[in-house]
């Protein structure tokens, strides 16, 4: 009833120059679709800094479905 031990296959050795070429081709000819990257790129084009998570301009409750309101953020202590 015991299963035979799986046969371990040896991988061929990888050369350092092969890795360098592969890393360069990973994102070549592909558009980056990250939202963070898009926001950073837009801010760079406008000449302003990207929004920070430590900025008080955001309340932390913003989501894709529910945008921040114009009213000031509510305090958790008040």
UniProtKB/Swiss-Prot annotation:
Amino acid composition bias (Basic and acidic residues), ranges on this chain: 64-78
Motif extent (Nuclear localization signal): 6-14
Record bears the keyword Nucleus: yes
Subcellular location: Nucleus
Segments of this protein annotated with the region Disordered: 1-33, 45-78
Record key words, sorted: Myogenesis, Nucleus
Record-stated family: Belongs to the MUSTN1 family.
Name the UniProt record assigns to this protein: Musculoskeletal embryonic nuclear protein 1
Lineage: Eukaryota, Metazoa, Chordata, Craniata, Vertebrata
Name of the gene: MUSTN1
């Amino acid at each position: 009833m015991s299963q035979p031990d799986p046969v371990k296959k040896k991988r061929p050795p990888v050369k350092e120059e092969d890795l360098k070429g592969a890393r360069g081709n990973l994102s070549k000819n592909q558009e980056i679709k990250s939202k963070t990257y898009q926001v950073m790129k837009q801010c760079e084009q406008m000449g302003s800094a990207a929004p920070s998570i430590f900025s008080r301009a955001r309340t932390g409750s913003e989501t894709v479905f529910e945008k921040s309101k114009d009213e000031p953020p509510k305090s958790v202590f008040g």
